[in-house]
A protein has these predicted regions:
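Short, charged/polar "capping" segments at the starts of alpha-helices
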Residues: 34-36, 74-78, 111-114, 139-147, ...
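Conserved acidic residues
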Residues: 23-25, 65, 101, 171-174
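Catalytic binding pocket for nucleotide-activated donors in carbohydrate/polymer assembly enzymes
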Residues: 64, 82-85, 181-242
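Structural motif
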Residues: 27-32, 50, 69-72, 105-110, ...
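Donor nucleotide-activated moiety binding/catalytic core segment of transferases
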Residues: 139-189, 193, 199
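Active-site and donor-binding regions of nucleotide-sugar-utilizing enzymes
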Residues: 1-82, 89
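Short, charged, surface-exposed secondary-structure boundary motifs
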Residues: 54-64, 77-81, 96-100, 164-169, ...
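Conserved catalytic-core segment of nucleotide-activated headgroup transferases in glycan assembly
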Residues: 88-150
Length: 244
C-alpha cells in the first residue's frame, strides 16, 4: 500500500507539472516508479544509464521513450525487452592514434583494490616506459591512491573529467581497472582494456559480457606480455575482444 500511495502522489505531482509545462521531459537513471507514472500522464521519459546495465524482467520493465546505454549488447537487449523505446548508444569516438600511456581507473573503496596487484602492474608498465595516469572514482574518499601516486610519482587525472574525456585527451594504449563502464567505453574508443577483477568475480547480473570484452590480468597475463612485445598484434586483439 505505501508504494501505491507514492505512485498516486507522483502521478498527481507530474500531472500538475505537465499542466504548467506541456512539453516537459524527465531524465533519470533508473527511477522505475517515476517512469510508470510519467507514462501514465503522458510525459516523455529518458533513462540515462550510469554504470553497467543490469538484466531486467520484461514483465515489469517500464515503458521509456528513450534509453541511453554504453554498449551494443545493452542496446540489443533493451530493444528486445522494450521494443517501442528508442534505444541509443552514448556517442563515442574511436581513436586513430594512441600514445604510450596507461590510465588506471580505480574503484571507490580501498578494500576493493589490491595494493599488491596494483604495484605489480605498475612495475610492469613502468619498466616498459609507459606513462601511467590514475583516475579516482568520483566518490572515492580513501588513502591508498594518494599513497601509490606518491610512491610511483604518478599523475592523478582531474576528477572533473569522466572516463571518456580522460581517454580522448590522453589517448592511452591501455586502460586498466575493475568492473566498470570505463573499460567498456575504452573498447569502443579503440583502446585495449585490462581487467584486474578476480577470476571468480560474478558478472552474471550484467548485460555486457565484461569478462569477454577485457583482457584479464589474472588469467591472460601471458597474452598481455606478448602484446607488449609485439604491438602489431594490437588491432587483432581489439577485434577479438569485440566479438569473443
Amino acid at each position: 500500500m505505501p508504494q501505491l500511495a507514492t505512485y498516486t502522489y507522483i502521478c498527481a505531482f507530474l500531472s500538475a507539472i505537465k499542466e504548467q509545462i506541456p512539453n516537459v521531459k524527465i531524465f533519470h537513471s533508473g527511477a522505475k516508479t517515476l517512469s510508470v507514472a510519467a507514462a501514465r500522464v503522458g510525459i516523455e521519459t529518458v533513462w540515462l544509464y550510469h554504470g553497467l546495465a543490469r538484466k531486467q524482467s520484461k514483465a515489469d520493465f517500464p515503458f521509456l521513450d528513450h534509453i541511453y546505454v554504453y554498449s551494443s549488447e545493452e542496446k540489443t537487449y533493451f530493444e528486445d525487452i522494450s521494443p517501442n523505446s528508442n534505444v541509443c548508444l552514448y556517442p563515442l569516438k574511436e581513436l586513430s592514434t594512441l600514445e604510450k600511456k596507461v590510465i588506471i581507473f580505480l574503484t571507490r573503496l580501498d578494500i576493493r583494490m589490491s595494493e599488491k596487484t596494483l604495484s605489480e602492474i605498475l612495475t610492469f608498465f613502468l619498466k616498459k616506459d609507459y606513462q601511467i595516469f590514475l583516475k579516482k572514482h568520483p566518490t572515492y574518499t580513501g588513502s591508498l591512491i594518494d599513497k601509490i601516486a606518491e610512491k610511483y610519482n604518478l599523475e592523478i587525472i582531474d576528477h572533473e573529467k569522466d572516463a571518456s574525456e580522460s581517454i580522448l585527451s590522453l589517448r592511452p594504449s591501455f586502460t586498466i581497472g575493475w568492473g566498470s563502464t570505463a573499460l567498456c567505453e575504452s573498447l569502443r574508443h579503440g583502446v585495449v582494456p585490462i581487467s584486474l577483477d578476480d577470476l571468480d568475480t560474478d558478472f552474471s547480473w550484467a548485460i555486457y559480457p565484461f569478462k569477454k570484452r577485457t583482457l584479464s590480468w589474472k588469467d591472460e597475463k601471458e597474452r598481455i606480455f606478448e602484446l607488449l612485445k609485439d604491438m602489431s598484434l594490437y588491432t587483432k586483439t581489439l577485434s577479438e575482444l569485440r566479438v569473443r
